[in-house]
Amino acid sequence: MITRDDALALDAADPLRAFRDRFHIPDPSVIYLDGNSLGMPPKRTLERLTEVFHDDWATGLIRSWDHWLDMPQRVGDVLAPLIGAGPGEVVLHDNTTLNVYQAVHAAIGLRPGRSVIAISADDFPTDRYVVDGIADALGFAVRHGFDQLDDVAVMVRSVIDYRTAELVDVAAETARAHAAGAMVVWDLSHAVGAIDIDLRGCGVQLAIGCSYKFLNGGPGAPAWTYVARELHDTIRQPIWGWYANEDMFAMGPTFRPRPDIARMMLGTPAILALAAAEVGIALSAEAGMPAIHAKGSALTGLAIDLCDQYGLATPTPRDATQRGNHVAVQHADAKAFVKELTAQGVIFDFREPNIIRAGCSPLTTRYVDVFDGLAAVARLAAR
């Protein structure tokens, strides 16, 4: 039987344990297992925002744009190694929904003559809604499932299932789609900062993701887009904004896209949000994705073992190589449980129809948090 002392022993031996002290945790009695929805705030974030406010905005005023202009690409270069991308292949901008729209539209443009978009019927809602909207506007067909790809222009997939945490074989599925002549847009929102992934090594050409979950970038933090360097000269995204223009200050009559990743941008970036996101991204870079992934696998492994111990059902894969950094607990009263536990300071989240998600954010989640959280669920289930 796993005991609380076992969890405390794992915490004592955790090579990443010191990172938790670098986050603002005003109430240590709160058990937070929802970093897969919103990460905790790093202490450095407030300091960094104060610096940008005082030194750049208040003191530098408009002159600060001299070093703000390329900030989306600079922060993208900090993020790039976390996903196996190269310098100049990632840019932070806008939000995930808009970036999905851009990437899918751009991918369609690279496959003329094809008019089918493939996506899972139970993928994350915003991805499905965007795909449906694009298909409606262009007169395309939406196919739910990936068995037939020979007539597909673009396949849209999440790396990790947002409910069960099942991890897709990105390399194999990318190769299969490319062999059928289809483009692929990968959504890494539940993967970035959680698993050690090599987009270049997997042959991925287009990907998007957020920075407010495992990267701890803050609520509403900017999303990001990855475009493999070999596509930079040919990819055309559908929203032509001045920030993506080759000479943005020429104010010319026509749009000519920039020759690099910045062609995926739109308008003026949110500098304060970028500054906050950079702090969280840099912390993950400092810890290193191999160590983060290893701890995430151990945390979720403990959660699954505790589910077994308490007789709680979970659809999350037991093979650590096939799951992300949350564990789904199924119960008919899941929604009521989450509401009651939240009131007690034990924070999970709920997903329809019957899932309690236990998010394990390796830089902040302790093994004892997992133990106490699952024990609290078990007490409610036993009533």
What residues fall within each predicted segment?
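Pyridoxal 5′-phosphate
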Residues: 1-383
